[in-house]
Amino acid sequence: MFSKETYISRRQELKKLVKSGVIILFGNNNSPCNFPNNGYYPFRQDSTFLYYFGLQRDGLVGVIDIDNDIETLIGDDIDLVDIVWYGSVDSVHDLATQVGVHNSAPMKTLKTICNDAMSKKRKIHILPPYRYDIKLQVFDLLGIHPNQQKEEASMDLIKAVVKMRSTKTQEEIEELERAAVIGYKMHTTAMKLVRPGVTEKYVAGQVSGVAHSYGSMVSFPTIFSQHGEIQHGYPSMNILEEGRLALCDAGAETMNNYCLLYTSDAADE
């Protein structure tokens, strides 16, 4: 996370750009891989939620009431069962304080906020959802069918977010430089491992491991293949052959989830 002041400043600028209404920024939820509780895919927070609220926990929503100048972090505190899995976790109130938000409330409050805004014909600004659980949540809250949510998303909010995130501050540039260093380590690792008899999957696994060792995760699934003509040639158990060209397309995210993209070619001579 950056400093509390960074997130306060970003939200203030967002309010100036959007001008009026209620902004709702949805964080991501855990996504089960094979079964609930401890079978999740690696958690990845929504980037826009991170930009304005900076918090990595699942099940959070940021609400910015521009006209009344009220910011609220919405989310439920963990229960005793969750403590078994996660240990001691900061309360939603404590999380809000960390990023300069003075108000917090349980998730059920979000429905009340939305109903109140709609009853007063106030504009509710959302971004186009891309996860199905969030699409269902938007449907429950605002009555907008998932098939219509892209069209109903706020263009004012989209333009404001694009404008702000397109300009990088010094602390963001430093994050991109960290991502560049990790990416360099990933691609030079691939170059060192390429030799006849090694599988594509082995090389890709080592490359991805570098991202997890020095950053938070890969920025997208590592592509490593002797079939460079295929755009998404994910690694297989194919064995590297002498004289063949191998394509490595891989990148990493820093602990603050900033990333760069790289592509390299390697050939065994």
Residue map of PLM features:
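Short, basic/aromatic beta-hairpin or loop at an interaction surface
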Residues: 217-228
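Anionic group-transfer/hydrolysis microenvironments
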Residues: 28-29, 67, 78, 227, ...
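Conserved small/polar residues in nucleotide/adenosyl-binding loops
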Residues: 262-269
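A composition/biophysics-driven feature that prefers long, compositionally simple stretches
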Residues: 1-185
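Acidic/histidine-enriched ion/cofactor-binding microenvironments in catalytic or ligand-binding pockets
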Residues: 52-56, 65-66, 229-258
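Active-site pocket-lining segments that scaffold enzyme catalytic pockets across diverse folds
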Residues: 171-192, 198-211
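Short beta-strand/loop turn elements enriched in aromatics
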Residues: 29-30, 205-219
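Short glycine/proline-enriched turns and hinge-like loops at secondary-structure junctions
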Residues: 74, 257-260
